[in-house]
Amino acid sequence: MIKILGIESSCDDTAVSIITENREILSNIIISQNTEHTVFGGVVPEIAARSHLSHLDKALKNVLKESNTKLTDISTIAATSGPGLIGSVIVGSMFARSLSSALKKPFIAINHLEGHALTARLTDNIPYPYLLLLASGGHCQFVAVLGLGKYKILGSTIDDAVGEAFDKVAKMLNLAFPGGPEIEKRATLGDPNKYKFPKPIINSGNCNMSFSGLKTAVRTLIMNLKEINDTVINDIAASFQFTIGEILSSKVQDAIRAYEQITNNFDKKNIVIAGGVAANKYLQEILSSCAKTYGYRLIYPPIHLCTDNAAMIAYAGLERYNNKLFTPLNFCPKARWSLEDISN
């Protein structure tokens, strides 16, 4: 049986997973660093890298035990090798390459974004091609996923990522870290029509997005309010989340038009939303409705596979393993690595 070991360390979560050739997840362990970064209100790169050093060995042992697997049973080792916090990426990549060398097993360098892009093929086994909205704390882009290693970016944020906007607004409201889930929770208690926020470049006619002006508008509102209580916080959260939904819905329509122009694909109408923001249930509902209007089906992974995890890295490794796309051990990890720059 083919077993793929996946290692993910692009930011502040240490993750290790083992999956089989049949897309069965035998074990998927994530060691969170939230408690280490909460006091700073965000991720501290040096702390993240040092924590990966202390967590990786433990995570690997737990995954092997939980999956009843020996290291010698592993067919190949796949590890995130960019993009991300370079210190964190190096730690995970070096750990994986050391295992590869010691075990004499192939190594596969995985682009973290490709891991997110292919998650829907792990969970739903959807065919190529499909339209992807990758929405996380570090990225926000529409991508035509044409095949393994074949990606066309249709549009992206010109400033902040949508996940970053969620986290920054949560910090303005003194909510806990990470901020995205806190905004979503508070939004269920608030009035989404209480405050009107701008929707930057929503009528640009292309797939690019902007969230910096929205974030600034929220900050300005908070500074001008005389009192900030729970009701106000809930209303701001709801109004902010509603505006994000409006922006993404509009841009999904632009992305569908751009996607259909380059694919001529009218029988496999799938839109995938991946990344941490894909876990937001409100956005799932809004974008599902938008997709349905155009005859598309919106697919999103289970919540535990929306955020950073190693199962998606292992699966991307499986697709590359099946195509004999291995990586030399002298591969240099990358802080920046576009999906369009992936080489097969």
Curated annotation (Swiss-Prot):
<dbReference type="GO" id="GO:0005737">
    <property type="term" value="C:cytoplasm"/>
</dbReference>
<keyword id="KW-0963">Cytoplasm</keyword>
<feature type="binding site">
    <location>
        <position position="180"/>
    </location>
    <ligand>
        <name>substrate</name>
    </ligand>
</feature>
<feature type="binding site">
    <location>
        <position position="116"/>
    </location>
    <ligand>
        <name>Fe cation</name>
    </ligand>
</feature>
<keyword id="KW-0012">Acyltransferase</keyword>
<feature type="binding site">
    <location>
        <position position="280"/>
    </location>
    <ligand>
        <name>substrate</name>
    </ligand>
</feature>
<protein>
    <recommendedName>
        <fullName>tRNA N6-adenosine threonylcarbamoyltransferase</fullName>
        <ecNumber>2.3.1.234</ecNumber>
    </recommendedName>
</protein>
<keyword id="KW-0808">Transferase</keyword>
<keyword id="KW-0479">Metal-binding</keyword>
<dbReference type="InterPro" id="IPR017860">
    <property type="entry name" value="Peptidase_M22_CS"/>
</dbReference>
<feature type="binding site">
    <location>
        <position position="308"/>
    </location>
    <ligand>
        <name>Fe cation</name>
    </ligand>
</feature>
<keyword id="KW-0819">tRNA processing</keyword>
<feature type="binding site">
    <location>
        <begin position="134"/>
        <end position="138"/>
    </location>
    <ligand>
        <name>substrate</name>
    </ligand>
</feature>
<dbReference type="InterPro" id="IPR022450">
    <property type="entry name" value="TsaD"/>
</dbReference>
<dbReference type="GO" id="GO:0005506">
    <property type="term" value="F:iron ion binding"/>
</dbReference>
<feature type="binding site">
    <location>
        <position position="112"/>
    </location>
    <ligand>
        <name>Fe cation</name>
    </ligand>
</feature>
<dbReference type="InterPro" id="IPR000905">
    <property type="entry name" value="Gcp-like_dom"/>
</dbReference>
<comment type="function">
    <text>Required for the formation of a threonylcarbamoyl group on adenosine at position 37 (t(6)A37) in tRNAs that read codons beginning with adenine. Is involved in the transfer of the threonylcarbamoyl moiety of threonylcarbamoyl-AMP (TC-AMP) to the N6 group of A37, together with TsaE and TsaB. TsaD likely plays a direct catalytic role in this reaction.</text>
</comment>
<dbReference type="GO" id="GO:0002949">
    <property type="term" value="P:tRNA threonylcarbamoyladenosine modification"/>
</dbReference>
<dbReference type="InterPro" id="IPR017861">
    <property type="entry name" value="KAE1/TsaD"/>
</dbReference>
<feature type="binding site">
    <location>
        <position position="167"/>
    </location>
    <ligand>
        <name>substrate</name>
    </ligand>
</feature>
<dbReference type="Pfam" id="PF00814">
    <property type="entry name" value="TsaD"/>
</dbReference>
<dbReference type="InterPro" id="IPR043129">
    <property type="entry name" value="ATPase_NBD"/>
</dbReference>
<dbReference type="GO" id="GO:0061711">
    <property type="term" value="F:N(6)-L-threonylcarbamoyladenine synthase activity"/>
</dbReference>
<comment type="similarity">
    <text>Belongs to the KAE1 / TsaD family.</text>
</comment>
<keyword id="KW-0408">Iron</keyword>
